[in-house]
Swiss-Prot record:
Domain comment (free text): The short coiled coil domain is proposed to be not involved in load-bearing and force transmission from the cytoskeleton but in mere nucleus anchorage instead.
Organism of origin: Macaca fascicularis (Crab-eating macaque)
Coiled coil: 103-129
Keyword Coiled coil: yes
Assembly and oligomerization: Self-associates. Interacts with SYNE1 and SPAG4/SUN4. Proposed to form a spermatogenesis-specific LINC complex with SYNE1 during sperm head formation possibly implicating a SUN domain-based heterotrimer with SPAG4/SUN4 associating with SYNE1.
Topological domain ranges for the Perinuclear space compartment: 70-361
Protein name: SUN domain-containing protein 3
Spans through the membrane: 48-69
């Protein structure tokens, strides 16, 4: 082979190698350029995923924080709200309690004040009558010659000793009138008087009338009750509303007396129509009977009498027992059969028992 042929072959060899090298280089370059879009896409996907997870985590933390704040703040606000509602509720019920004061009580106060005023005028009138009586007696004294002495000039001279006697007589008369005014009308001992030791036996007594208007309420719960107990009938304080009421027109009560007595009479008392807030006394008892109980209030019932309380009569009415007994009794039972027309209840103000006490208590 000649030298030119070798040189030509070598040049071709090196040319092919350079082309292969350049081709591989360009291929690798193209490959890397083809691979770059895939790498960039993966990176963007991860960024999106991470940002989404971060956002979700942030939102979740915020939601949990908001829920926790609600759970801590709302109960406190609720308690404050309930406290405010309770306070205003109590004020409202207090106001309602004041407004719930029945008009009857206001009328009752007016009636009582009017009664006191009338009594005051009666006392003033009585004092005036006493003064007139004094003047008349003195005029009678001055009109008698025996009550005067004459001086030398013919002028009458009043006898001081006689004047003192007359003043003493007038003073005794005034004291007698005042004593009669203070004395009880019945003028008999009351052995059913609570202050003397008498009492009501609840087991033998009817239930009291339940009057919702006589109660005060707070949040729907009654906490004050103005109903009168049965033993109010054993006390001398008789004024409108101060009575024991039982439902309907029939009821009974068992009274343990202050001491053993042989009963002879009973007294029933009610208020007058003039001082009644309603203008009538239809709740007053009408027909009633009285029994004596032997053996410590648990024995046989002994009939003592049946009577009628007259509402048009005096307020204090005494009844002599129709059946006399010879043994001493400690308990008396009062049975009421009817009233004077009230449809809901009967009201008993005072009941007294009179008689002869035993020698030993």
């Amino acid at each position: 082979m000649s030298g030119k042929a070798k040189a030509r072959r070598a040049a071709m060899f090196f040319r092919g190698c350079s082309e292969d090298a350049s081709g591989s280089t360009s291929g690798s370059t193209l490959l890397s350029e083809d691979e770059n879009p895939d790498t960039n896409g993966v990176t963007r996907s991860w960024k999106i995923i991470l940002s989404t997870m971060f956002t979700l985590t942030f939102l979740l933390v915020g939601l949990l924080s908001h829920q926790w704040l609600k759970e801590t703040e709302v109960p406190q606000k609720s308690r404050q709200l309930y406290a405010i509602i309770a306070e205003y509720g109590s004020r409202l019920y207090k106001y309602q309690a004041r407004l719930r004061m029945p008009k009857e009580q206001l009328e009752l106060l007016k009636k009582e004040s009017q009664t006191l005023e009338n009594n005051f005028h009666k006392i003033l009138l009585l004092i005036e009558q006493i003064d007139v009586l004094k003047a008349l007696l003195r005029d009678m004294k001055d009109g008698t010659d025996n009550n005067h002495s004459w001086n030398t000039h013919g002028d009458p001279v009043e006898d001081p000793d006689h004047t003192e006697v007359l003043d003493e007589e007038m003073s005794n008369l005034v004291n007698y009138v005042l004593k009669k005014l203070r004395e009880d009308q019945v003028q008999m001992a009351d052995y059913a008087l609570k202050s003397a030791g008498a009492s009501i036996i609840e087991a033998g007594t009817s239930e009291s009338y339940k009057n919702n208007k006589a109660k005060l309420y707070w949040h729907g719960i009654s906490f004050l009750n103005h109903e009168m107990p049965p033993d109010i009938i054993l006390q001398p304080d008789v004024y409108p509303g101060n009575c024991w009421a039982f439902p309907g027109s029939q009821g009974h009560t068992l009274i343990k007396l202050a001491t053993k007595i042989i009963p002879t009479a009973v007294t029933m008392e009610h208020i007058s129509e003039k001082v009644s807030p309603s203008g009538n006394i239809s709740s007053a008892p009408k027909e009633f009977s009285v029994y004596g109980i032997t053996k410590k209030c648990e024995g046989e019932e002994i009939f003592l009498g049946q009577f009628i309380y007259n509402k048009t009569g005096t307020t204090v009415q005494t009844f002599e027992l129709q059946h006399a007994v010879s043994e001493y009794l400690l308990c008396v039972k009062l049975n009421i059969f009817s009233n004077w027309g009230h449809p809901k209840y009967t009201c008993l103000y005072r009941f007294r028992v009179h008689g002869t006490p035993g020698k030993h208590i």
